[in-house]
Amino acid sequence: MIKGIGLDMIDLERVKQVVEKNPRFIERVLTEKEIKQFEKYEGNRKIEFLAGRFAAKEAYAKANGTGFGKHLSFTDVEILQVEDGRPHVTLPANAGENVFVSITHTARSAAAQVIIEI
């Protein structure tokens, strides 16, 4: 049964400006494991990775119906690339959900869609 569907899109230039102004933004959005994947990239690909993860986490919060705040933070949701290249969502052990995520990029933006199944 589908619990929710979320969609988010973000401008790459906006993410780049935020990171330039506040580099700690990366640590607020990404988990330690995600940061290790992020650090493997160079230049604009880093911004694409960060923006894609940000959009995916926002899409998750929308699909969950909670948004981010008191009960959910960006680092509660971890999205890692698995061996075949797909993004895989890891949640706290008590979540009891199946989460499907798709992330895409253009030259100017990143977008993600999340479907939560219970």
Curated annotation (Swiss-Prot):
Cross-referenced Gene3D superfamilies: 4'-phosphopantetheinyl transferase domain
Source organism superkingdom: Bacteria
The entry's keywords: Cytoplasm, Fatty acid biosynthesis, Fatty acid metabolism, Lipid biosynthesis, Lipid metabolism, Magnesium, Metal-binding, Transferase
Function according to Swiss-Prot or TrEMBL: Transfers the 4'-phosphopantetheine moiety from coenzyme A to a Ser of acyl-carrier-protein.
Biological processes per GO annotation: fatty acid biosynthetic process
Organism for this UniProt entry: Listeria monocytogenes serotype 4a (strain HCC23)
Localization, UniProt: Cytoplasm
Protein name (database record): Holo-[acyl-carrier-protein] synthase
Cofactor(s) for this UniProt protein: Mg(2+)
NCBIfam families recorded: acpS, pantethn_trn
Similarity section: Belongs to the P-Pant transferase superfamily. AcpS family.
This enzyme's EC code(s): 2.7.8.7
Binding residues for Mg(2+): 8, 58
GO function term, MF aspect, one: holo-[acyl-carrier-protein] synthase activity
Alphabetized InterPro entries for the sequence: 4-PPantetheinyl_Trfase_dom (IPR008278), 4-PPantetheinyl_Trfase_dom_sf (IPR037143), ACPS (IPR002582), Ppantetheine-prot_Trfase_dom (IPR004568)
GO cellular component: cytoplasm
